[in-house]
Amino acid sequence: MKRSGTLRLLSDLSAFGGAARLRELVAGDSAVRVRGSPDGRHLLLLRPPGAVAPQLLVASRGPGAELERAWPAGQPSPLDAFFLPWPARPALVLVWESGLAEVWGAGVGPGWRPLQSTELCPGGGARVVAVAALRGRLVWCEERQARAEGPSGSPAAAFSHCVCVRTLEPSGEASTSLGRTHVLLHHCPAFGLLASCRQLFLVPTATTWPGVAHVLLIWSPGKGKVMVAAPRLGLSYSKSLNPGRGDTWDFRTLLRGLPGLLSPREPLAVHTWAPTPQGLLLLDFGGTVSLLQSHGGTRAVGTLQEAPVGPWGSAALGTFQGTLACVLGSTLELLDMGSGQLLERKVLSTDRVHLLEPPAPGMEDEEELETRGNLRLLSALGLFCVGWEAPQGVELPSAKDLVFEEACGYYQRRSLRGAQLTPEELRHSSTFRAPQALASILQGHLPPSALLTMLRTELRDYRGLEQLKAQLVAGDDEEAGWTELAEQEVARLLRTELIGDQLAQLNTVFQALPTAAWGATLRALQLQLDGNGKLRSQAPPDVWKKVLGGITAGKEPPNGILPPFELLCQCLCQLEPRWLPPFVELAQQQGGPGWGAGGPGLPLYRRALAVLGEEGTRPEALELELLLSSGRPKAVLQAVGQLVQKEQWDRALDAGLALGPSSPLLRSEIFKLLLAEFAQHRRLDAHLPLLCRLCPPELAPAELLLLLRTYLPDEVGPPTPFPEPGAEPPLTVGLLKALLEQTGAQGWLSGPVLSPYEDILWDPSTPPPTPPRDL
């Protein structure tokens, strides 16, 4: 029975937030750029720069707020926008001509919110002319100061562009990880960028230098290759282009080394480009559709019954199930990809139609499983599915049905009874549990494509490691190779459960290449200094949980194997000792219950001190900083005691004054410790103003005098008006007056008289009454 093409209505757009605005933009602006998210739940509409507001609309199906942005006149709007293929949550990236890139995410809070902002062209003077998103990478073509190299229209100005790439991956629940910028091509013409699921196509534009406007490039990041093709010449060449190995090409040098590519040839006359999983579709002005494949070869697909109406006529191309779909104005044509035969032609009710790629495999909703692999068509009337209608009467059994049918035959062969078993009996009988268990597993199973999407990061890392190992075996740039290998291995290990062999491997990497290992940890924890010189981290809690985890009872590692936190402290002691106290302080802020901070077991500062060695052999400066920054009362008192022994009065007083109002008892203990020194000798007299500031506000003058009496040294003889030569001067009332005034002032301000010394301190103008004289 002959199949027929169908347009099945998936949604009338009422299920999308902001449906009225969505219909208005689709129906009113033919130049609007439309993209669908990988999960099929979001639609992105972007008007070209200079269009009326709003320029950006992201409509979401079901729960979830839409995103609508407008930029006022004089302020540039985004050059392009893309959804990112992140399985955990929807995300999109906006790129401006100036090089500004913003990453927005949903699902981590109410509505859409910005996750990160970065500059793609930090040096200034550059202009982004094209951008594309390719499987966790952001690729852009930028123009670099063409006017400085030559006048407009000159070869120097025409080859003043470069193509750059930067990795863009999710990191934790609400952050992103941006890699370093790599230059793929420099001194190249202006290229348009089109991305499919595996390749990036660099195509000529209207401003490309005519002498090279017949050349296209196909970059395959997974293979680390770039294909240079000239379809009209029938030539294609393959070259290595792997940013991970530092590969880069000068475009002019690249073409000079490929015979025949610079032969005089007219530029490609292409009306519409369309990337597909099979390659790049080219529609010329005569209505002929060709396919440029990943190996550089070109083949004709077929000729449409209608040709594009001029260069500005709308056209959209796509493929599904071996079929080419082309929308020209209000006409939809379906051609067989193999033979080029016209299969069906439909006249649509509107010419404002946009073709959308199907959702990524494994990310579809349950309602869309029936339309898997089919194209989607968006108009103001709704969202439609373009596909083939299967012949009536043909219904494929589900995986659950196949399980029970296969089990039925298996049990029937082993059964001794003559009655015939049926699949329905196996479904409801409690005797046959194996097929029921298998059917329940299959009901919630993930397809291989979804599993591959989830494991893509790990697979990419493993592949990169294997390539790097091969490079090291070959002896190419060993120092940089070992550094990159260590960084990748540490990043991989931090994503695993750090026990057993993984923990031993992490220790080995830190011992062999500590600098590279610490650099990888620095990026994993996203450590950076703020304006006050304090360490800050944007890493998600699960990363810190692995780093701060201690030793579980019964799972002690072998001798010489350190837990991750101790390993990082040891590495910092070797590389940057001054970073150790701020790192431990930050770790204590990040730790949760049972992580090694704030839970049972040794506190983090004591674990860090254990790395420094036994007591008495540790570096004194580091030990003091760790104790002071720990925030633990015993540790701070121990540090202040050591400072007092060394007579470092300023640091001891600063340690007490640095404590906030939330630590009154600790401040009081430090004050008493220093007050005892003040009572016994005069080496603290120069710091009396700071000691007065440290005085507890609730301390009354009488209590102060009682404390001083406790700390005063015992008198060994009768009192004398003057100290012996060479002896320590005693405490005088003049020195004590400042402290008494401090406590008296606080007591006066707090309310009633707190001691019998208040009248002396606060009313010196009124002398006491004269005692009567004995006559």
Curated annotation (Swiss-Prot):
GO terms for biological process: blood coagulation; intracellular transport; lipid homeostasis; lipid metabolic process; lysosome localization; melanosome assembly; platelet dense granule organization; protein localization to membrane. Pfam families: HPS6, HPS6_C. It is found in: Microsome membrane; Cytoplasm, Cytosol; Early endosome membrane; Lysosome membrane. It comes from the Eukaryota. GO terms for cellular component: BLOC-2 complex; cytosol; early endosome; early endosome membrane; endoplasmic reticulum; intracellular membrane-bounded organelle; lysosomal membrane; membrane. Keywords: Albinism, Cytoplasm, Endoplasmic reticulum, Endosome, Hermansky-Pudlak syndrome, Lysosome, Membrane, Microsome. GO terms for molecular function: GTP-dependent protein binding; small GTPase binding. InterPro entries: BLOC-2_complex_Hps6_subunit, HPS6_C, HPS6_N. Its main location: membrane. Ubiquitous. It is linked to Hermansky-Pudlak syndrome 6: A form of Hermansky-Pudlak syndrome, a genetically heterogeneous autosomal recessive disorder characterized by oculocutaneous albinism, bleeding due to platelet storage pool deficiency, and lysosomal storage defects. This syndrome results from defects of diverse cytoplasmic organelles including melanosomes, platelet dense granules and lysosomes. Ceroid storage in the lungs is associated with pulmonary fibrosis, a common cause of premature death in individuals with HPS. May regulate the synthesis and function of lysosomes and of highly specialized organelles, such as melanosomes and platelet dense granules. Acts as a cargo adapter for the dynein-dynactin motor complex to mediate the transport of lysosomes from the cell periphery to the perinuclear region. Facilitates retrograde lysosomal trafficking by linking the motor complex to lysosomes, and perinuclear positioning of lysosomes is crucial for the delivery of endocytic cargos to lysosomes, for lysosome maturation and functioning. Component of the biogenesis of lysosome-related organelles complex-2 (or BLOC2) composed of HPS3, HPS5 and HPS6. Interacts with HPS5 and HPS3. Interacts with biogenesis of lysosome-related organelles complex-1 (BLOC1). Interacts with AP-3 complex. Interacts with MNAT1. Interacts with DCTN1 and dynein intermediate chain. This is BLOC-2 complex member HPS6. The gene is HPS6.
